[in-house]
Amino acid sequence: MSATPPIVPTATPKVGFVSLGCPKALVDSEQIITQLRAEGYEISGTYDGADLVVVNTCGFIDEAVQESLDAIGEALNENGKVIVTGCLGAKKSASGSGLIEEVHPKVLAVTGPHALGEVMQHVHTHLPKPHDPFVDLVPAAGVKLTPRHYAYLKISEGCNHRCTFCIIPSMRGDLVSRPVADVMLEAENLFKSGVKELLVISQDTSAYGVDVKYRTGFWNGKPIKTRMTDLVGALGELAAQYGAWVRLHYVYPYPSVDEVIPMMAEGPYKGHVLPYLDVPFQHAHPEVLKRMKRPANAEKVMERVKKWREMCPDLTIRSTFIAGFPGETEEQFQTLLDFIREAELDRVGCFAYSPVEGATANELDGALPDEVREERRARFMEVAEEVSAKRIAKKVGKTLKVLVDEINADGGIGRTAADAPEIDGVVYIAPAAKASKRYKVGDFVSVKITGADGHDLWGEV
């Protein structure tokens, strides 16, 4: 990295920002931007309007690595002063040196993920902060990169699992749970700012508190254990006060999840703790799961899914899977297809297995040809979409609560409790006439569902 002298801005220093990767990386970006704003920096929407640029990278799969390297290159070409942070910053090249520094030696500095303090130190070094920070001008909820009516709430960092296809622990470290009081304070500030939906995220939401032995914290004078079940209950109580939603992501299928389902189905938190689980099953055959080092047993998972649906018939389950994992036989793949049909998962994504540099799965025998992996992914998605279409068709004729995300010339676009933003379906709301006068973005409206197609619904207010 070059020893570049500090930039001397002619007015208020401006920082450009590029955020790549998953919602967890987005939260890291929000924290950095919040701190920049608190210290008096302006955020520039263009390269040429910025004194320097921060690029928050992703390094999980090869495509993400290339996208991040390209983004860094673009920022260097367009601006020339670039600080890099994020998962790719922790990735080494084949020679053992930093990958980013090797590909782009002109960057000013590189940090790993979840490195607010380091990033700010580098910003201060290369672009000294203003003398009069305006901390009071920054909202208590912080600066958010999502629309104003929903936000991601990250409850922990890192992961204790060592799945063979994943390199996240090498980049983000072991599980570190946030203090429950900090999580609740952020949630309250977000609700106060007008957020109508909180999306709880982490690498492993079910493991929240394991690292601190579920120690008891306090919020508004009440004891709350650092444990997923207790946190969800507290968030549900808070959401009920603001008429808002709480949605759970990255939930491993541990027995403790059984304690959360009743909150979705009945009691004071029904309608606030959404009947929605994002559960990364990844596969269903025990031998494949063993090679993946996944903390799950397929038979017990099926029993658990059935139990969840018995407790909460409206439950929506989203999951992701990998097809064509090293050593996967056709018989094992058929077991996966059978699981999808029997479990009747509502929302499903699938990746054809792709080697990730640094993953231990690369050392496994039985690597499958690209065409086999892609063919299995296509077959998987065909079955998954059939199941999803049957599930969603059952909603026609029902009246559902919808959170409005957008209003345009054709009417409104929103989501039900079964739809997370950006990854699930939407509801197209008619009529278009006077839509903007009847409701606004962030409102909840009751919609009579009149049609379904693929992952989306159509309806009328």
UniProtKB/Swiss-Prot annotation:
Domain TRAM, first and last residues per copy: 393-461
Name of one Pfam family that matches: TRAM_2
This protein's record includes keyword Cytoplasm: yes
Domain Radical SAM core: 145-390
EC number: 2.8.4.4
InterPro entries (alphabetical): Elp3/MiaA/NifB-like_rSAM, Methylthiotransferase, Methylthiotransferase_CS, Methylthiotransferase_N, Methylthiotransferase_N_sf, NA-bd_OB-fold, Ribosomal_uS12_MeSTrfase_RimO, rSAM
Gene Ontology terms: biological process: tRNA modification
GO molecular function: 4 iron, 4 sulfur cluster binding; aspartic acid methylthiotransferase activity; metal ion binding; protein methylthiotransferase activity
Record text on cofactor binding: Binds 2 [4Fe-4S] clusters. One cluster is coordinated with 3 cysteines and an exchangeable S-adenosyl-L-methionine.
Positions of [4Fe-4S] cluster 1 binding: 22, 58, 87
Cited function: Catalyzes the methylthiolation of an aspartic acid residue of ribosomal protein uS12.
Family: Belongs to the methylthiotransferase family. RimO subfamily.
HAMAP family assigned: MTTase_RimO (MF_01865)
Protein name, UniProt field: Ribosomal protein uS12 methylthiotransferase RimO
Gene name of this polypeptide: rimO
